[in-house]
């Protein structure tokens, strides 16, 4: 009888997280968050048109620290997802597929996302 307590290969416990896997997961995660935020943005637009009380509640919420934090991260996710999508388009054309280029462009995408987000918020 075989040992049933052994880890199944490949298993997450034996892998060391790499920037390529983390950026891939982050790209999918930001896509899900952005898709979900479209629904919330639609509710916000309808509230502006039809319900004065809900409009005032939403405006006061997005003026608060928590609302601004949500907007900060949604904009950060959008910038990251957009830039990483451009990176994927270059990969589809066959550019930047060497592992060193993948790592360099990954760090560039992270850096540009943070820089552009802070630029949007503070300038």
What residue ranges belong to the model's regions?
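Membrane-embedded alpha-helical bundles that constitute the cytochrome b-like, heme-associated redox core
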Residues: 1-123
């Amino acid at each position: 009888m075989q040992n049933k307590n052994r880890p199944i290969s490949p298993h997450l416990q034996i892998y060391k997280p790499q920037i390529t896997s983390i950026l891939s997961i982050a790209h999918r995660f930001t896509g899900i968050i952005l898709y979900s935020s479209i629904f919330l943005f639609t509710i916000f637009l309808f509230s502006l048109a039809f319900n004065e009380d809900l409009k005032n509640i939403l405006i006061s919420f997005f003026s608060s620290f928590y609302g601004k934090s949500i907007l900060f991260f949604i904009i950060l996710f959008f910038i990251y997802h957009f830039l990483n999508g451009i990176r994927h388009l270059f990969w589809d054309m066959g550019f930047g597929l060497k592992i060193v280029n993948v790592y360099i462009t990954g760090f560039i995408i992270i850096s540009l996302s943070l820089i552009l987000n802070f630029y949007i918020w503070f300038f």
